[in-house]
Amino acid sequence: MKCRLIATGERAPSWVAQGFAEYQKRLSHWMPLELVEIEPGLRGKGRDAQRATDDEGRRVLAALPKNAYVVALDVPGRPLSSEQLAQRMEHWRGQGRDLALLIGGPEGHSAEVLKSASESWSIGPLTLPHMLVRLIVAEQLYRAAAMLANHPYHRA
């Protein structure tokens, strides 16, 4: 199973990119992780935020791998502990399809993106910079894969 993390937003600062690359490298033993950056919609004075979100949504949907199992990261989604994420990863692997994880823009995902998702995952009620979410997701995917492989990384 390959995983494509589709994230709406600008290019990440170097410290985020370095952290993401580190977990991407570690995770490659168990699951290739690809980052696809989606250009954010135009926002600002006199601009319609919903139109920007819908534009982003169209670009996200176009970036989905064919027949992928789609999981949208969304605040009202299902919260998962690290152990529960490992169980979900095992389930996703059992689907026999690639995985697409979606990180939305400032207003979240468009209705079309949420409709396309097989499930939604909440990493918690905190408001986090979307760049940081990329790094958190990469680390948690690595942690879940390490747990499934009985690797000593996870010590809870």
Curated annotation (Swiss-Prot):
S-adenosyl-L-methionine binds at L73, G104, I123, G124, P125, L126, T127, L128. This is Ribosomal RNA large subunit methyltransferase H. The keyword Methyltransferase applies. Homodimer. One of its GO terms (cellular component) is cytoplasm. Its EC number is 2.1.1.177. It catalyses: pseudouridine(1915) in 23S rRNA + S-adenosyl-L-methionine = N(3)-methylpseudouridine(1915) in 23S rRNA + S-adenosyl-L-homocysteine + H(+). HAMAP family: 23SrRNA_methyltr_H (MF_00658). It is found in: Cytoplasm. Keywords: Cytoplasm, Methyltransferase, rRNA processing, S-adenosyl-L-methionine, Transferase. Specifically methylates the pseudouridine at position 1915 (m3Psi1915) in 23S rRNA. Belongs to the RNA methyltransferase RlmH family. Coiled coil: none annotated. GO terms for molecular function: rRNA (pseudouridine-N3-)-methyltransferase activity. It comes from Xanthomonas oryzae pv. oryzae (strain KACC10331 / KXO85). It is an enzyme of class 2 (transferase). InterPro entries: Alpha/beta_knot_MTases, RlmH-like, tRNA_m1G_MTases_N.
